[in-house]
Amino acid sequence: MAIERVRQHLESRGWDGEILEFAESSATVELAAEMVGTEPARIAKTLGFSDPDSPERAILVVAAGDVKVNGGRFKRRFGGKPRMLRGDEVPALTGYPIGGVCPFANPEGARVFLDESIRRFESVFPAAGTATSAVEIRIAELPELTGAEGWVDVTVGWAAT
């Protein structure tokens, strides 16, 4: 099960928090914010793109819930226009279904990046592998827990506080 895979991944890296599971969908930023009781911006959406250098790989960008990816910034950082993964590509390239994509325990080859938009928070809530789960993670722990390749600045619609 996806949640168990996420739990094992996080615990193997020293995390000891709780995965939140819901009776109803938390697949959108608004639904997730309502379920966890926070503002939408603190929902960390994991956006899946085709890697311009290697289309059979995913680039996963963990961004705040109130932002949009800027095509020019993405192209400057990754060398090609952003192309969201198609529905049939999502499970194969991310390891999770649409609505449950998260930056933990992804298939080999998936590249995870953390967007600057989430640094304004002490913690954020990414999905935990299903459309009915979330997990609160401190920003300071995200690089280690995700195995991210680094921080990027590819979004617009927010301002540092």
Where are these regions (language model features)?
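Extended, low-hydrophobicity, polar/charged segments
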Residues: M1-T161
